[in-house]
From Swiss-Prot:
Zn(2+) 2 binds at residues 436, 448, 474, 478. Residues 495-638 form the SET domain. Residues 202-358 form the YDG domain. Disruption phenotype: Impaired gene silencing due to decondensation of chromocenters leading to the derepression of DNA-methylated genes and transposable elements (TEs). One of its GO terms (molecular function) is histone methyltransferase activity. The gene is SUVH2. Although both SET and pre-SET domains are present, the absence of the post-SET domain may explain the lack of methyltransferase activity. Besides, the Cys residues in the SET domain that normally bind a zinc ion are not conserved. In the pre-SET domain, Cys residues bind 3 zinc ions that are arranged in a triangular cluster; some of these Cys residues contribute to the binding of two zinc ions within the cluster. Pfam families: Pre-SET, SAD_SRA, SET. The lineage of its organism: Eukaryota, Viridiplantae, Streptophyta, Embryophyta, Tracheophyta. It comes from Arabidopsis thaliana. PANTHER family: HISTONE-LYSINE N-METHYLTRANSFERASE FAMILY MEMBER SUVH2 (PTHR45660:SF81), HISTONE-LYSINE N-METHYLTRANSFERASE SETMAR (PTHR45660). Residues 434-492 form the Pre-SET domain. Keywords: Centromere, Chromatin regulator, Chromosome, DNA-binding, Metal-binding, Nucleus, Zinc. This is Histone-lysine N-methyltransferase family member SUVH2. Histone methyltransferase family member that plays a central role in gene silencing. Together with MORC6 and SUVH9, regulates the silencing of some transposable elements (TEs). According to PubMed:15775980, it is required for normal methylation of 'Lys-9' and 'Lys-27' of histone H3, 'Lys-20' of H4, and cytosine, but PubMed:19043555 see no significant effect on histone methylation when the gene is mutated. According to PubMed:19043555, the protein does not bind S-adenosyl-L-methionine and lacks methyltransferase activity. The keyword Magnesium does not apply.
Amino acid sequence: MSTLLPFPDLNLMPDSQSSTAGTTAGDTVVTGKLEVKSEPIEEWQTPPSSTSDQSANTDLIAEFIRISELFRSAFKPLQVKGLDGVSVYGLDSGAIVAVPEKENRELIEPPPGFKDNRVSTVVVSPKFERPRELARIAILGHEQRKELRQVMKRTRMTYESLRIHLMAESMKNHVLGQGRRRRSDMAAAYIMRDRGLWLNYDKHIVGPVTGVEVGDIFFYRMELCVLGLHGQTQAGIDCLTAERSATGEPIATSIVVSGGYEDDEDTGDVLVYTGHGGQDHQHKQCDNQRLVGGNLGMERSMHYGIEVRVIRGIKYENSISSKVYVYDGLYKIVDWWFAVGKSGFGVFKFRLVRIEGQPMMGSAVMRFAQTLRNKPSMVRPTGYVSFDLSNKKENVPVFLYNDVDGDQEPRHYEYIAKAVFPPGIFGQGGISRTGCECKLSCTDDCLCARKNGGEFAYDDNGHLLKGKHVVFECGEFCTCGPSCKSRVTQKGLRNRLEVFRSKETGWGVRTLDLIEAGAFICEYAGVVVTRLQAEILSMNGDVMVYPGRFTDQWRNWGDLSQVYPDFVRPNYPSLPPLDFSMDVSRMRNVACYISHSKEPNVMVQFVLHDHNHLMFPRVMLFALENISPLAELSLDYGLADEVNGKLAICN
C-alpha cells in the first residue's frame, strides 16, 4: 500500500469511553450477516486493488471507519453488574447471560436416541436445522457419566461401522463402473442424522459434551457433528448464530485449530486464534476481516465468560487420512484485538487460555508418543527393561517398561508371535490343501469369499467390516499374492506396543501408535492344548487361557441394526463351541499382558488361514474403537463382575 491511511493503530483497542460519548440511549448494536470461518474459505473474495487512486483510498478509509463504528457499538455503556461480578447487558436487552455454576440453569435430558441409542421411529427431515438455544449439561454422578460414555462409544462404533461399510460398497461400485466414489464419512453422518442417531442435536451445548473426554481422537470433521462436539463441517468457529439466537447475538461454543490461518499462534495452554474471513482458496489472507458471525460470537463469549471447546487438527499419517482431530478441553477467551496480519490485512485475534484442572491435552500426548517411538531413552532415561521383548520375532519392536519396581517377569518367558499347534492336534484331514485360484488379489466370487458367506471380511485398508463367528483368510495354498486384501492377521503385528508395569493392573499393554477402529492389533498366542491336556497341565500349576470364554464383543462391531431395522447379523460361517485352551506358562506374546475390563477397547475375532479345522481357530485381536497413543489396551476375558482392571492372564 503506497499511502498512509488516517486511522488509529490497529493493534490498539479502541477507546470505549471516548467512542461512546456521542451515542444516544436509542442506539442499537450493529451486527452483520453471519460469515463462518471455513478451512479453507469456500467463496472467492476479490483482493483489494493495489492502485493508489483517490477512489480506492476513499473506499478503504470508509471501510475502517465502519469497523471503528462497529467497535464503538460493541462497547456501549449499557452494562450493569450481575452475579459474581459478571457484567451483563441491561435487563431489557434480552442478552444471553452466563449463569454461574451455583445458580439454577436449564438441566437438559439426553436427546432422542441418546438414552438407549435406539433408532427413533420418526425419521428426521433431511432439511436439518441447527439448535436455537444454548444449554449446559447438568453435573452428573460417576455412574451416569460412565453410562453416557458407553452411549457415546456405541454411537461412534455405529458411525465407524457404517462408514467402513459405505466405503467398501462405494469402492465395489466404482470398480464395477457403477458410479464414482463418494465421501463415506459424510454419507454415514447424514444417514445417522436422518435416523435420529446424532447426539445433542436439539441443543447447542456450552462447555463439556457428556461422554466425550479430553484426548479423544477423531478422523473426520463429520464425526464431531454427530457427537455435538463441533457443529460445523468446515467452519473453524461454531456458534449459536445471531439469526437463530433469541437475543440477536452470536455465542461461540467451540473452535477447530487446524493451521489454516497464518496468524495463529499455538503454545498449547495459550492459544492466539485468528478470526474468520478474508481468505482466498489458497488460504492466503486477501481482505480485511469484520466483526461479524463467528468473530462477533468469540467476542460475545469472552464478554459473558463462556468457555469454548478446542479441537486441534494434527498432521498424522495413517491409512485413513493425513490428519486427525483431538479434543483438548475447555479454554477461556481472555483478550481480543484487531491487528494487521502477516499478509498486510486486518485480522481479529483472540487469546485463549486453557482452564486448569483438566487432563493432559491429547495433542501433547500424541507429540510425546511420537518422540517416545523415535527416541525412547531420551524421553525416559530410566525404566526400560528391554527395547524389544519379542527378540525381533515381531515386525516391530515391543518395549518392556517398569518404573514401579524391579520385576522383569516378562523376560523369563519364551516369546512367540503366533500360537503353537502341537503336531497331530487336528487329527486326520485337519490341514486343507485347497485354496482359491485368484491371481494377485481375490475376486468377489472366489472360494475364500464364499467361505465367508459370499463377501470379504476386510476393506481395502485391512479393517474388519463386521464381526463374525469366524473369518476365513486366504492361506498357504491360495494362489493370490501377499497383497491380497484377504490376508490381514497373518501378516502379524504392525503397531508398536509397550508392556508396562502398573500398580493397578500388575502388567499391562499400551499402544505407542494410533490404532484405528476395526484395525487388526495382534494374535493372542500360547501353546494350544486339548481340554484333557489342559486339565492335566492345570493340576501342575500351568497358566491357562480359555478362548471360548472371551465375550462375543465381535457382535457389536459392524452391527447396523440401529441404522437399518432389517439388518441381520451374519450367522455364516458358524463356529462350534470351542473346547481348547492355550497354555501360556512358558511361551507367550504381548497379548497375554492385556488387562481385563468390562468396557474393553479390544475384541476377539476368531480367524482361520493356515488350516480349516473349525475347532481350533486362531485368536485374533481387533480394535473396537479408535485407540489413542499411550492408551492401555483392555479385553473382556469373560470373568466374574467383581474382577475388573486386574491382570487376567488366566480366565
